[in-house]
Protein backbone atom coordinates (compact mmCIF):
# COMPACT_ATOMS: atom_id res chain seq x y z
CA UNK A 1 0.00 0.00 0.00
CA UNK A 2 2.74 2.44 0.95
CA UNK A 3 4.42 2.27 -2.45
CA UNK A 4 1.16 2.77 -4.32
CA UNK A 5 0.13 5.70 -2.12
CA UNK A 6 3.60 7.24 -2.36
CA UNK A 7 3.38 7.03 -6.14
CA UNK A 8 0.07 8.89 -6.12
CA UNK A 9 1.44 11.57 -3.79
CA UNK A 10 4.56 12.08 -5.92
CA UNK A 11 2.44 12.34 -9.06
CA UNK A 12 0.16 14.90 -7.44
CA UNK A 13 3.08 16.98 -6.16
CA UNK A 14 4.80 16.88 -9.56
CA UNK A 15 1.77 17.99 -11.53
CA UNK A 16 0.98 20.71 -9.01
CA UNK A 17 4.52 22.02 -9.45
CA UNK A 18 4.09 21.89 -13.21
CA UNK A 19 0.90 23.92 -12.92
CA UNK A 20 2.78 26.79 -11.35
CA UNK A 21 5.47 26.74 -14.03
CA UNK A 22 3.48 26.11 -17.19
CA UNK A 23 0.02 27.32 -16.11
CA UNK A 24 -1.45 24.40 -18.03
CA UNK A 25 -2.80 22.60 -14.97
CA UNK A 26 -5.66 23.62 -12.69
CA UNK A 27 -5.04 22.48 -9.13
CA UNK A 28 -6.51 22.83 -5.67
CA UNK A 29 -5.73 21.73 -2.13
CA UNK A 30 -8.15 21.71 0.77
CA UNK A 31 -7.71 21.24 4.48
CA UNK A 32 -10.05 20.90 7.41
CA UNK A 33 -9.23 20.28 11.07
CA UNK A 34 -11.22 20.07 14.31
CA UNK A 35 -9.75 19.68 17.80
CA UNK A 36 -11.65 19.47 21.10
CA UNK A 37 -10.41 19.16 24.68
CA UNK A 38 -11.85 18.89 28.18
CA UNK A 39 -14.10 15.92 28.89
CA UNK A 40 -13.43 14.63 25.38
CA UNK A 41 -10.18 14.96 23.47
CA UNK A 42 -10.78 14.55 19.77
CA UNK A 43 -8.84 15.56 16.67
CA UNK A 44 -10.01 15.30 13.07
CA UNK A 45 -7.86 16.17 10.05
CA UNK A 46 -8.96 16.05 6.42
CA UNK A 47 -6.86 16.78 3.33
CA UNK A 48 -7.81 16.78 -0.36
CA UNK A 49 -5.71 17.48 -3.43
CA UNK A 50 -6.86 17.72 -7.05
CA UNK A 51 -5.12 18.57 -10.28
CA UNK A 52 -6.26 18.43 -13.91
CA UNK A 53 -5.10 19.37 -17.37
CA UNK A 54 -7.55 19.64 -20.26
CA UNK A 55 -5.52 19.58 -23.48
CA UNK A 56 -6.49 19.39 -27.12
CA UNK A 57 -6.25 15.61 -27.42
CA UNK A 58 -5.93 14.37 -23.82
CA UNK A 59 -7.26 15.16 -20.37
CA UNK A 60 -5.43 14.28 -17.16
CA UNK A 61 -7.01 14.21 -13.71
CA UNK A 62 -5.51 13.15 -10.37
CA UNK A 63 -7.06 13.15 -6.90
CA UNK A 64 -5.90 12.36 -3.37
CA UNK A 65 -7.82 12.60 -0.12
CA UNK A 66 -6.90 11.62 3.41
CA UNK A 67 -8.83 11.52 6.67
CA UNK A 68 -7.57 10.85 10.20
CA UNK A 69 -9.67 10.91 13.36
CA UNK A 70 -8.47 10.31 16.90
CA UNK A 71 -10.35 10.25 20.19
CA UNK A 72 -8.64 10.23 23.57
CA UNK A 73 -5.31 9.58 21.88
CA UNK A 74 -6.65 6.51 20.04
CA UNK A 75 -6.96 6.53 16.26
CA UNK A 76 -10.60 5.86 15.31
CA UNK A 77 -10.38 6.43 11.55
CA UNK A 78 -7.53 6.61 9.07
CA UNK A 79 -8.19 6.29 5.37
CA UNK A 80 -6.72 7.35 2.05
CA UNK A 81 -8.19 7.36 -1.44
CA UNK A 82 -6.49 8.32 -4.69
CA UNK A 83 -6.99 7.95 -8.43
CA UNK A 84 -5.55 9.01 -11.76
CA UNK A 85 -7.59 9.16 -14.97
CA UNK A 86 -6.42 9.75 -18.53
CA UNK A 87 -8.92 10.57 -21.29
CA UNK A 88 -8.10 10.34 -25.00
CA UNK A 89 -10.43 12.75 -26.75
CA UNK A 90 -12.45 11.82 -29.82
CA UNK A 91 -14.82 14.05 -31.80
CA UNK A 92 -17.85 15.87 -30.35
CA UNK A 93 -17.33 15.43 -26.58
CA UNK A 94 -16.58 11.70 -26.83
CA UNK A 95 -13.47 10.10 -25.32
CA UNK A 96 -11.83 6.84 -24.29
CA UNK A 97 -10.40 6.66 -20.79
CA UNK A 98 -8.24 4.59 -18.47
CA UNK A 99 -8.36 4.95 -14.70
CA UNK A 100 -6.35 3.63 -11.73
CA UNK A 101 -7.74 3.95 -8.20
CA UNK A 102 -6.49 2.91 -4.77
CA UNK A 103 -8.01 3.07 -1.29
CA UNK A 104 -6.59 2.24 2.12
CA UNK A 105 -8.84 2.14 5.19
CA UNK A 106 -7.67 0.01 8.09
CA UNK A 107 -11.10 0.23 9.76
CA UNK A 108 -13.04 -1.04 6.73
CA UNK A 109 -12.03 -4.69 7.08
CA UNK A 110 -9.71 -4.37 4.06
CA UNK A 111 -6.04 -3.43 4.18
CA UNK A 112 -6.35 -1.93 0.70
CA UNK A 113 -8.33 -2.06 -2.54
CA UNK A 114 -6.97 -1.23 -5.99
CA UNK A 115 -8.96 -1.02 -9.22
CA UNK A 116 -8.19 -0.41 -12.89
CA UNK A 117 -10.85 0.35 -15.51
CA UNK A 118 -10.92 1.45 -19.13
CA UNK A 119 -13.88 2.50 -21.20
CA UNK A 120 -15.94 5.22 -22.83
CA UNK A 121 -16.73 8.73 -21.56
CA UNK A 122 -18.95 11.50 -22.89
CA UNK A 123 -19.86 15.05 -21.96
CA UNK A 124 -23.65 14.88 -21.72
CA UNK A 125 -24.28 18.54 -20.90
CA UNK A 126 -22.18 21.63 -21.50
CA UNK A 127 -23.51 25.18 -21.22
CA UNK A 128 -22.62 28.44 -19.51
CA UNK A 129 -23.80 27.28 -16.09
CA UNK A 130 -23.71 23.50 -15.98
CA UNK A 131 -21.74 20.47 -17.15
CA UNK A 132 -22.51 16.77 -16.86
CA UNK A 133 -19.95 14.06 -17.65
CA UNK A 134 -20.73 10.35 -17.81
CA UNK A 135 -18.52 7.30 -18.25
CA UNK A 136 -18.72 3.53 -18.26
CA UNK A 137 -15.97 0.94 -18.42
CA UNK A 138 -14.72 -2.54 -17.61
CA UNK A 139 -11.86 -3.49 -15.34
CA UNK A 140 -10.55 -5.45 -12.38
CA UNK A 141 -10.43 -4.87 -8.62
CA UNK A 142 -7.93 -6.38 -6.21
CA UNK A 143 -8.77 -6.42 -2.49
CA UNK A 144 -6.42 -7.29 0.35
CA UNK A 145 -8.31 -8.42 3.44
CA UNK A 146 -7.23 -7.62 6.98
CA UNK A 147 -6.34 -11.32 7.30
CA UNK A 148 -3.74 -10.91 4.54
CA UNK A 149 -5.74 -12.81 1.92
CA UNK A 150 -6.25 -11.28 -1.54
CA UNK A 151 -9.32 -11.35 -3.78
CA UNK A 152 -9.55 -10.33 -7.46
CA UNK A 153 -12.78 -9.70 -9.35
CA UNK A 154 -14.00 -8.23 -12.62
CA UNK A 155 -15.92 -4.95 -12.38
CA UNK A 156 -18.13 -2.64 -14.42
CA UNK A 157 -17.71 1.03 -13.53
CA UNK A 158 -20.38 3.70 -14.10
CA UNK A 159 -19.79 7.33 -13.10
CA UNK A 160 -21.38 10.77 -13.42
CA UNK A 161 -19.99 14.21 -12.53
CA UNK A 162 -22.28 17.25 -12.41
CA UNK A 163 -21.13 20.85 -11.89
CA UNK A 164 -23.51 23.80 -11.59
CA UNK A 165 -22.28 27.38 -11.31
CA UNK A 166 -24.73 29.15 -9.01
CA UNK A 167 -22.96 32.50 -9.24
CA UNK A 168 -19.50 33.91 -9.83
CA UNK A 169 -18.56 32.93 -6.27
CA UNK A 170 -20.58 29.74 -5.62
CA UNK A 171 -20.41 26.28 -7.24
CA UNK A 172 -22.43 23.11 -6.60
CA UNK A 173 -20.96 19.69 -7.48
CA UNK A 174 -22.35 16.16 -7.43
CA UNK A 175 -20.25 13.07 -8.19
CA UNK A 176 -21.64 9.54 -8.33
CA UNK A 177 -19.83 6.31 -9.14
CA UNK A 178 -20.53 2.61 -8.82
CA UNK A 179 -18.07 -0.23 -9.36
CA UNK A 180 -20.15 -3.35 -9.83
CA UNK A 181 -18.13 -6.50 -9.24
CA UNK A 182 -18.79 -10.21 -9.38
CA UNK A 183 -18.47 -10.39 -5.57
CA UNK A 184 -19.31 -6.88 -4.35
CA UNK A 185 -20.37 -3.42 -5.45
CA UNK A 186 -18.66 -0.24 -4.23
CA UNK A 187 -20.57 3.03 -4.65
CA UNK A 188 -19.37 6.54 -3.86
CA UNK A 189 -21.22 9.85 -3.71
CA UNK A 190 -19.88 13.34 -3.04
CA UNK A 191 -22.19 16.36 -2.79
CA UNK A 192 -20.49 19.70 -2.25
CA UNK A 193 -21.11 23.44 -2.22
CA UNK A 194 -18.19 25.85 -2.35
CA UNK A 195 -18.21 29.62 -1.97
CA UNK A 196 -15.34 31.96 -2.73
CA UNK A 197 -14.02 33.91 0.25
CA UNK A 198 -11.23 35.98 -1.23
CA UNK A 199 -9.07 35.59 -4.31
CA UNK A 200 -8.18 31.92 -4.74
CA UNK A 201 -9.49 30.92 -1.31
CA UNK A 202 -12.91 29.29 -0.86
CA UNK A 203 -14.93 27.49 1.80
CA UNK A 204 -16.43 24.10 0.97
CA UNK A 205 -19.14 22.03 2.63
CA UNK A 206 -19.29 18.40 1.48
CA UNK A 207 -21.19 15.20 2.20
CA UNK A 208 -19.46 11.94 1.24
CA UNK A 209 -21.21 8.57 1.28
CA UNK A 210 -19.33 5.32 0.54
CA UNK A 211 -21.05 1.94 0.41
CA UNK A 212 -19.60 -1.54 -0.02
CA UNK A 213 -22.22 -4.26 -0.54
CA UNK A 214 -20.00 -7.02 0.89
CA UNK A 215 -17.75 -6.40 3.89
CA UNK A 216 -16.08 -8.59 6.54
CA UNK A 217 -18.13 -9.51 9.61
CA UNK A 218 -18.31 -6.68 12.14
CA UNK A 219 -17.79 -3.93 9.55
CA UNK A 220 -20.42 -1.38 8.51
CA UNK A 221 -21.35 -1.34 4.83
CA UNK A 222 -21.83 2.45 4.64
CA UNK A 223 -19.51 5.28 5.71
CA UNK A 224 -20.81 8.86 5.85
CA UNK A 225 -18.58 11.90 6.17
CA UNK A 226 -19.57 15.56 6.50
CA UNK A 227 -16.73 18.05 6.15
CA UNK A 228 -16.15 21.79 6.11
CA UNK A 229 -12.81 22.71 4.55
CA UNK A 230 -10.85 25.63 3.16
CA UNK A 231 -9.86 25.28 -0.50
CA UNK A 232 -6.97 27.04 -2.22
CA UNK A 233 -6.99 26.93 -6.03
CA UNK A 234 -4.07 27.70 -8.33
Residues covered by each model-derived region:
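Transmembrane beta-strands of outer-membrane beta-barrel proteins
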Residues: 28-32, 48, 61-65, 83, ...
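Residues on the lipid-exposed face of transmembrane beta-strands in outer-membrane beta-barrel proteins
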Residues: 29-33, 47-53, 84-88, 118-122, ...
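Hydrophobic, lipid-facing positions within transmembrane beta-strands of outer-membrane proteins
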Residues: 27, 43-49, 64, 78-84, ...
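Solvent-exposed loop/turn segments connecting transmembrane beta-strands
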Residues: 35-43, 71-77, 104-112, 146-152, ...
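Repeated loop/turn-to-beta-strand initiation elements of outer-membrane beta-barrel proteins
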Residues: 25, 57-62, 93-96, 128-132, ...
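Outer-membrane beta-barrel proteins
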Residues: 53-57, 90-92, 121-126, 142-144, ...
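Transmembrane beta-strands of outer-membrane beta-barrel pores
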Residues: 33-37, 55, 66-70, 102-106, ...
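Predominantly the C-terminal beta-signal and adjacent terminal strand-loop region
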Residues: 184-234
Amino acid sequence: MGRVLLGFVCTLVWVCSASAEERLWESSVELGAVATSGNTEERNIKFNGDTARDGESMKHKAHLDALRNSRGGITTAQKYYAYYQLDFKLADHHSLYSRLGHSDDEFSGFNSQTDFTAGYARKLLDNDRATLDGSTGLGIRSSELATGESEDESIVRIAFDYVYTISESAVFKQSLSSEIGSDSTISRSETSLSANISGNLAMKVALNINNNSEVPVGTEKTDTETAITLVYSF
